[in-house]
Each structure stands twice: as structure tokens, then as C-alpha cells.
Amino acid sequence: MKHSKLTAAVTAVLAAALLAPGAHAQKLVPVKVQLKWFPQAQFAGFFVAQAKGYYKAEGLDVQFLPTGDQSPIQTVATGTADFGTTWITDLLTARAQGIPVVHIAQLFQKSGYTLVALKSSNITKPQDFKGKRVGVWPSGNEYPAVALLKKYGLTTSLDSTVSNPDVQAVTYPFDPSIVFPDKVDLVSAMTYNEIDQIVGLGYSLDKLRIFRTADYGINLLEDLMFTTDRTLKTANFKGSGQSGQQIAAKLVRATLKGWNYAVTHQAEAVSIVLPLCGNTCKGSGTRADAKSHQTWQMAEVAKLYNTGPTTRGLAGYLDPAVYRNNVALLRNLGILKASPDAGAVTYSVWEAATGKKAPR
């Protein structure tokens, strides 16, 4: 009887020791993520997931790599990063070039791309773009503008085969103050970033005519999460004893949790983002204050996350109909010569992360 009591006591002590904090601390799996741009509220869900410990709760030690000269496609494809964020145009064109990148979650389910003109220019519809100068971004970021122009039968100076284009495209490095409104009649602007910068330059919203490409059927999807075929097929990710597929699902699950929190706690999300970005968080002119600009940005990206009649309640889900539309748009532009292979998108990671069956 005494022996039984002693055994029970020892067992209880051992159990308490095993349950004590740090007694058997889980070894976190290192994961590197390359974001598409500098830290800002555009990526709030990631930073909130980090700050709230959502990644650690999944057993992940997530490191965000600083934005450099290389694109996320390059850093992920070469193995410098394990996962990344990019736009669907970048992912599909890379896949078409034989780079084995794979879409695993769609964060922004509506495009935030716009073309902005002054109301005083009397540009009221896309047909009025003819004979105008349009400011566009380089490196594939011009595709939404080109797609909109093509839809309305307008050619651009970006097409070297056209001798007398309808629209003069002016490529510039993202800052609208460089070209607008003196050097271009319309300028590219994301709802969550450059529009606020333009307002800061002294052009209030009531003075602007904003053409949102999604409103004209050009809903080329933006921020998504991706990895490579190689990572998803890895049986033992970095010696963790877990497959790449399992790690991907954990990363997506924690990231979506971070996004869900950020969207519903926007002020707190902004407070988490601000210390991470410094000058890169600032706007322009009267909107230069980082907190003001990031508050605007957080409110606007929240409108892009988990939106649409078929995706509401399905955060991170890629609507197949929207995807097919995006492929058709890129093929129509001649950017894709053929439809992507089936491996360009996987729903298995999203299903494992959410415990839901992806509607098809």
C-alpha cells in the first residue's frame, strides 16, 4: 500500500514537472517569409500573427526577410525564403516560365488597383483615356491598366508593334508626386496607399475621379501566399519531422488568424505595424504622418480581405471563377500563351489550414 502511494506521488511530481512551463519547450521550426514590399499595413495580418504569438502556437519561428532588389518569386524559387507574398500576375507568369511556384492562399480577394484623374480634366469614363498620358508602374505592375485600356479598344506606347498608340504610357517608380498631375493625366494608385498620398499632395477626394479596375471587370488579384512544388513535396521540412505541406498549413492558419484579428482590431494592428517600418510608413504632404497614413491603409486593405459573394466567410480562399477570369485576362493580353497547369494552384493547404472543404 505504501509502495502504491509512493508510486502515485512520484507519478504526480513527474506529471507536474512535465506540465511546467518550459519543461519540454517545443523546438520551433524556422520559416522564412518574403513579403512583396516594405513593412506597412498592407501586411498587417502577418505582423499581428507574429506579435500575438500565433506562429509560435503553431510551432513556427517565422522570420520576415527585408525587401530588396529581388522579387519574392526569386527569393522563394532559389530557396532563400520558404514562402512569400506576391500578385497573381507575377505568380502565373513565373509558373509559365518554368519556375515551380504554387499558390496556397488568397489574402486579398478584390483588387485595390485604380487609375486616378483630376475631375477638372473632364475624364469621366475609360473611353476618355484616348489621347491621354497614363502613369504606370514597371515590372508587371502595369498589367491591370493595360488590361483596362485593351478592354476599351485602346492601344498603348508599351506595345512596340503599335506606331501610333491611343495612350502614352509613362512608367514611373511608384511615387505619384513624381508625375501627377503635371506629367500624366491619369496615375496608377492603390486604394490603400497612393490615393492617400495624392490626397496629401493637396487633391481632396472630391477633386478626384477614381477608376477602380475591378469595377470594370479587371479584378486581377493581388496579395496571395505562395511557395514551391519542392517545399510542398518535402517529407521532412528542415529536419522538423513534419512535411512541407503541414508547415504550409500551419503558416496559413496562423496568418489568417492574424488577418482576422487585424481587420477587427484595426487601431491595435496599426500600433503593431508602426514600429516595424519607420519612414516607409509615411504618406505625402499633409498626409505624411505615419500613423494617419497607416490608419488609412489598414481600413482600405480590410476591404480587400475576405470580400465578395462567394468568398465571404472563407478567408484565404481563391474563388475558382475569379481565377479563371484572371487567366483569361492574362491570355487576352498575350502575357500568358496558354492556361497554367493544374499545379499552379493548390487548395489542399487551405483546406488543411481551415478544416473546410474548398468550394469548386
Language model regions located:
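Sec/Tat signal peptide C-region and signal peptidase I cleavage site
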Residues: 19-25
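Secondary-structure end/capping motifs
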Residues: 236-335
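Conserved C-terminal helix/tail region of periplasmic/extracytoplasmic solute-binding proteins
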Residues: 320-360
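Bacterial N-terminal signal peptides that target proteins for export
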Residues: 1-10
